[in-house]
């Protein structure tokens, strides 16, 4: 079983929506995902035409430092495919895109409770930037 990373295509949106719901508990809206495909890089790994792993890269610009960077979100792998190199394969593709697009750094946020993910990020040479996230919600 080969592990191939590809960009999410319109024909795979329904599978991706099911994946997001299963992994993150969010019911993504098809029209929003279609917009995100045009705006961001959504990389997926499929098995039997089903999305089983994914990462989203949002290109941002740090105007004070005059640097482009990727903000990483929605990195996930279905439970039965974990610890088999899927997330590492996604990150290998991310590293290729970093070089191709003159990206200066990667950034992501991760909840304190996600210790397994933290080990993975540290293994990928991410450094912890001591920050707190503040959120204000509006109805």
Which residues does each PLM region occupy?
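Conserved active-site alpha-helix within GNAT-family acetyltransferase domains
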Residues: 88, 112-132, 136
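Conserved N-terminal entry element of GNAT/NAT acetyltransferase domains
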Residues: 1-11, 139
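Conserved acetyl-CoA-binding loop-helix of GNAT-fold acetyltransferases
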Residues: 74-77, 83-96, 123
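Acetyl-CoA-dependent GNAT
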Residues: 7-67, 73
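Short coil/turn motifs at secondary-structure junctions
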Residues: 60-62, 80, 113, 139
């Amino acid at each position: 079983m080969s592990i191939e990373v590809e960009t999410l295509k319109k024909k795979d949106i329904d599978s991706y929506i099911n994946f997001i719901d299963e992994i993150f508990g969010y019911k993504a809206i098809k029209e929003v995902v279609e917009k995100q495909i045009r705006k961001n890089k959504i990389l997926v790994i499929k098995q039997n035409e089903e999305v089983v792993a994914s990462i989203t890269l949002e290109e941002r610009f740090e105007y004070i430092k005059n640097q482009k960077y990727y903000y990483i979100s929605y990195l996930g792998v279905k439970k039965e495919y974990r610890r088999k190199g899927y997330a590492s394969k996604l990150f290998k593709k991310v590293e290729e895109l970093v070089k191709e697009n003159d990206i200066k750094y990667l950034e992501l946020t991760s909840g304190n409770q996600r210790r397994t993910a933290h080990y993975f990020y540290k293994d990928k040479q991410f450094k912890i930037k001591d920050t707190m996230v503040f959120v204000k919600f509006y109805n």
